[in-house]
């Protein structure tokens, strides 16, 4: 089992920010990544639909023999975390609690903002996670169009700036000093988000904290990859267009994406792979 890959799942390419952090902290591990781009974005979908798509992708990862699951998607974490932990015999790591932990440590005023998809914000998953953090005030804002910009590779420009100013106005009015990027796509928008919020506001991504949790679970369960094994290899699967996934995904992860293949469940619809 120690030689098995870590399974990472997201609705698209955003979870590659988490994959990048995992590889930085655990360079000796191999990854198997599934991006459900055929059904992205998850944010506008009903929770039950998100749960169904997410569990189908997680089923594929478990069937492929991963030793640990990372749900690198806030919407999916909110929709199916409890189900996943009951359904599978491997450990499950998610992104909401790690981001909350980092934000609580970072805030000076106790006023924290969280931005995310409609599914994440309406689930109130962050409110639940912050319930035990005394002295904090949470302001939540849905930013439904951000994921589409990122999936299209657009991370700057006048249109995006105007949209960001409109989305973040409630956080500015609430005078938050910390903002959780409550979607793993959003770290690619830190330039425009940071510009709008100003230098005094800390932006919190769940990626590094989730990677730390992944490290802790591997250590706890004795699942570190045997260093005597051959060098680790990584596989990237998508339910959508592999060429588009590879093009945008390399901006998140870098040269580790040498090829993207169609996920098994999507193979009847498309049977192709793209290399570099």
Swiss-Prot record:
Transmembrane segments: none annotated. Substrate binds at residues 10-11, 42-43, 74-75, 184-185. It comes from the Bacteria. Keywords: Cell shape, Cell wall biogenesis/degradation, Isomerase, Peptidoglycan synthesis. It catalyses: L-glutamate = D-glutamate. Gene3D superfamilies: 3.40.50.1860. The keyword Zinc does not apply. Its EC number is 5.1.1.3. The active site is at residues 73, 183. GO terms for molecular function: glutamate racemase activity. Belongs to the aspartate/glutamate racemases family. This is Glutamate racemase. It comes from Parafrankia sp. (strain EAN1pec). The lineage of its organism: Bacteria, Bacillati, Actinomycetota, Actinomycetes, Frankiales.
């Amino acid at each position: 089992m120690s030689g098995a890959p870590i399974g990472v799942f997201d609705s698209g390419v955003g979870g590659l920010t988490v994959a990048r952090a995992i590889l930085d902290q655990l360079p000796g591990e191999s990854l198997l990544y599934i991006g459900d781009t055929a059904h992205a974005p998850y944010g506008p979908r009903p929770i039950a639909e998100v749960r169904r798509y997410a569990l189908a992708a997680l089923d594929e990862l478990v069937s492929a023999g991963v030793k640990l699951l990372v749900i690198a998607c806030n919407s999916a974490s909110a929709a199916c975390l409890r189900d996943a932990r009951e359904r599978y015999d491997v450990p499950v790591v998610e992104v909401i609690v790690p981001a909350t932990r980092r934000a609580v440590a970072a805030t000076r005023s106790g006023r924290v903002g969280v931005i995310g998809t409609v599914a994440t914000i309406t689930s109130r998953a962050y409110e639940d996670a912050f319930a035990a953090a005394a002295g904090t005030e949470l302001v939540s804002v849905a930013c439904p169009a951000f994921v589409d910009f990122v999936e299209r590779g657009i991370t700057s420009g006048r249109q995006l700036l105007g949209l960001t100013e409109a989305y973040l106005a409630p956080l500015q009015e609430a005078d938050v000093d910390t903002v959780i990027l409550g979607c793993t796509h959003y770290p690619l928008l830190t330039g425009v988000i940071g510009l709008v919020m100003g230098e005094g506001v800390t932006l919190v991504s769940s990626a590094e904290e989730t990677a730390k949790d992944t490290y802790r679970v591997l250590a706890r369960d004795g699942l570190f990859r045997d260093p005597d094994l051959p060098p680790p290899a990584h596989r990237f699967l998508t339910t959508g267009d592999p060429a588009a996934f590879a093009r945008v995904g390399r901006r998140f992860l870098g040269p580790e994406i040498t090829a993207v293949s169609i996920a098994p469940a999507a193979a009847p619809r498309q049977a192709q792979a793209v290399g570099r």
